[in-house]
Curated annotation (Swiss-Prot):
This is Gastrula zinc finger protein xFG20-1. It comes from the Eukaryota. Pfam families: zf-C2H2 (PF00096). Residues 304-325, 390-407 have a biased composition (Polar residues). May be involved in transcriptional regulation. GO terms for biological process: regulation of DNA-templated transcription.
Length: 675
């Protein structure tokens, strides 16, 4: 839309099945004032979309030969056919954009008018059309009408369901134009593109903006091809860039890109993608090279790095005289002085790094479908193959400072990591390797020999390095310390510990997309999906998924309440309940919502409140399948809809089962815990 001094554009009568006009676009830019509509009192075109399913009791004589869908009314059938043919007969008279349905065109016109007449009564956000408002309301109601047929998970919006279903189908429609890697989510592709640390050689001759990729430049140049003469609209500008900057001050309310999670609307796709990252726990592509911290955007990273002040630097470099905060930072710096600098390549994007710490921090940005790789010798787990290969070399010969083997075999094919070639194959199991030395190391697995024995407990190991690592469990020596919090451990546990600081969770659940720091956590979590309950109660026969839950359950038989309040003498079975109770005496509300700032005295209340923002509905009615955000709503539903009046809901667990038992012509119900 351009700033234009002319008569209001009047759409031909009955163009859209109405005699009303769209809000006109008479605007004055000569003084740089904000745009204002001259006929704001005109009625807004509210779009009412009729659902053909309302006439569910009538016949549907119109059948689509392409997909078999049936329709009651011929106009709906004809509109549907256009979706298959790709026809778009309804064009916008302002920007020439075309649509298959008239209703979509009417919705689109609100982009040009800037009006948002539909307000949310819960949070005062406004929207251009009724459909956007209805989608947004699901944030408050928690409604999730779109269910995945594969796993039963529900979603508030169809586009989110479509995105989720790709995790089942494996479809990856978004490809990187630089390296060909494919992704199931557009957001992951955008994050991946940032890993191509390239210069920006592609210059826009119109505005001087530079781009890393030619394709991005070509896409950008389209905005210049639609620019009218710079002096046409009154105010003049020296170049197109300044005109675009000027026009942006008048289009602040025209934001056609809605967030499907919270309903907020943005001016362009980049702003939308940046915002959507705040809703996820996904990868954070900006690692701090000083302390393993990883951040969502460059601004957060720079703010964090300012905490590494000059006053905290006490370790001097013998080469340059510079001082550093910790040993990790000093070693990273010193590696830049050596002539035999080790370039460790990233197998995902080809980037090279000075040391293993930098490489590990970088590789945490490649979280798309990471698969844990175990070392066959000692069981240590790694997140990528290059890291595993580097580790395996420590089982065969002395390693360099960075743990990279320097035998002649390992220098035969320096480009193998980039080509993916694995020329050395095991004749026993067919497994292939990059290096001959790693193959030799692997062959020991098939011999079964374990010549290294622990004199303390008699345990045997294939390699001496594994034995030394094991012996530290007897001596108490912890040779490796975390340079962030001074915790000590063996190297394998130290790597696990670093994930506390980096936030890396390389073990994904294939059932529900949750991720975990440790393999043991993932295995424990799987019991939720399998229903395995290996810990039975000897008193009542009830079984539990985890031993800790069984211990808590046993207190219901013994009556043990070990946690006592010193203020009022009240006792509690569980420590979290005791700690929550203490806040009733202090009046403190230590739990605050990061979304709206509301404070709560108890964590469970905060967690329940969060569901209002996330739309989560974990409580399901076993009678009709309806889901609810809060347990109290489920109880009310059982009573008012199904006539069920449970005697008590005394449990403090998250989930509730209502078991229906048939007794002749009647039914009885029993409320139980879901472990």
């Amino acid at each position: 839309m351009f700033c234009k001094e002319e008569e209001p554009y009047e759409f031909p009568e009955n163009t859209f099945g109405t005699n009303e006009l769209l809000p006109n676009y008479q605007q004055n830019c000569t003084d740089g004032e904000a745009i204002s509509d001259t006929k704001s009192d005109l009625a807004y075109l509210e779009v009412e979309i009729t659902d053909a399913h309302e006439e569910s009791n009538t016949d549907k004589p119109f059948t689509c030969t392409e997909c078999g869908k049936t329709f009651t009314r011929k106009p709906n059938y004809e509109s549907h056919i256009r979706a298959h043919k790709g026809e778009k007969p309804f064009s916008c008279m302002v920007c020439d954009k075309a649509f298959a349905w008239k209703s979509n065109l009417l919705v689109h016109y609100s982009v040009h008018s800037g009006e948002k007449p539909f307000s949310c009564t819960e949070c005062d956000k406004t929207f251009s059309n009724k459909a956007q408002l209805e989608k947004h309301l699901r944030v408050h109601t928690g409604e999730k009408p779109y269910s995945c047929e594969q796993c039963g998970k529900s979603f508030a919006h169809k586009c989110v369901l479509d995105s989720h279903q790709r995790t089942h189908t494996g479809d990856k429609p978004f490809s990187c134009t630089e390296c060909g890697k494919k992704f199931s989510q557009r957001g992951n592709l955008h994050k991946h593109l940032k890993t191509h640390k390239l210069d920006q050689p592609h210059l826009c001759a119109e505005c001087g903006k530079t781009f890393s990729f030619k394709s991005t430049l070509l896409e950008h140049q389209k905005i210049h091809s639609e620019i009218r003469p710079l002096s046409e609209f009154g105010k003049t500008f020296s170049d197109a860039h300044n005109l675009l900057k000027h026009q942006s001050t008048f289009t602040e309310e025209q934001k056609p890109f809605p967030c499907t999670e919270c309903g907020e609307i943005f001016s362009n796709e980049h702003e939308l993608l940046t915002h959507q990252s705040t809703h996820t726990e996904e990868q954070k592509p900006f690692p701090c090279t000083k302390c393993w911290g990883i951040f969502s955007n460059e601004h957060e990273l720079r703010t964090h790095q300012s905490t590494h002040t000059e006053g905290q630097k006490s370790l001097p470099s013998t080469e340059s005289g510079g001082t550093f905060s910790n040993e990790h930072e000093l070693l990273t710096h010193q590696s830049t002085h050596t002539e035999e600098q080790k370039h460790l390549p990233c197998t995902e994007c080809g980037g090279t790094f000075t040391n293993e710490q930098e490489l590990l921090a970088h590789q945490s940005t490649h979280t798309e479908e990471q698969k844990p790789l175990p070392c066959t010798e000692c069981g240590e787990i790694f997140s990528d193959e290059h890291e595993l290969l580097t580790h395996q070399s420590t089982h065969t010969s002395p390693s360099t400072e960075f743990g990279v083997q320097t035998t002649e075999d390992n220098h035969q094919s320096p480009s193998k990591d980039h080509t993916g070639e694995k020329p050395f194959s095991c004749s026993e199991c067919g497994k292939s390797f990059f290096y001959k030395s790693v193959l030799k190391d692997h062959l020991v697995v098939h011999t079964g020999k374990k010549p290294y024995h622990c004199i303390e407990c008699g345990r045997s190991y294939t390699h001496q390095s594994s034995l030394k690592s094991h012996q530290r469990t007897h001596t108490g020596v912890k040779a490796f310390s975390c340079n962030l919090c001074d915790k000590l451990s063996i190297i394998s546990k130290l790597r696990l510990h670093y994930r506390v600081h980096s936030g890396e969770k390389p073990y994904p659940c294939t059932e529900c997309d949750k991720t975990f720091t440790k393999k043991e956590q993932l295995e424990s979590h799987y019991k939720v999906h399998t229903g395995e309950k290996p810990y039975p109660c000897q008193q009542c026969g009830k079984s539990f998924s985890h031993k800790s839950v069984l211990k808590l359950h046993l207190r219901t038989h013994t009556g043990d309440k070990p946690f006592s309040c010193t203020e009022c003498g009240k006792t509690f079975t569980r420590k979290p309940n005791y700690e929550s109770h203490l806040t009733t005496h202090t009046g403190k509300k230590p739990f605050s919502c990061t979304e709206c700032g509301k404070e709560f005295a108890w964590k469970r209340n905060l967690e329940a409140h969060y569901k209002m923002h996330t739309g989560e509905k974990p409580f399901t009615c076993t009678e009709c399948g309806k889901t609810f955000t809060w347990k109290s709503n489920l109880r009310s539903h059982y009573t008012t809809v199904h006539g069920i009046s449970p005697i008590q809901y005394a449990c403090t667990e998250e989930d509730v089962n209502v078991i229906k038992t048939e007794e002749g012509d009647s039914f009885s119900y029993m409320v139980t815990l879901e472990n």
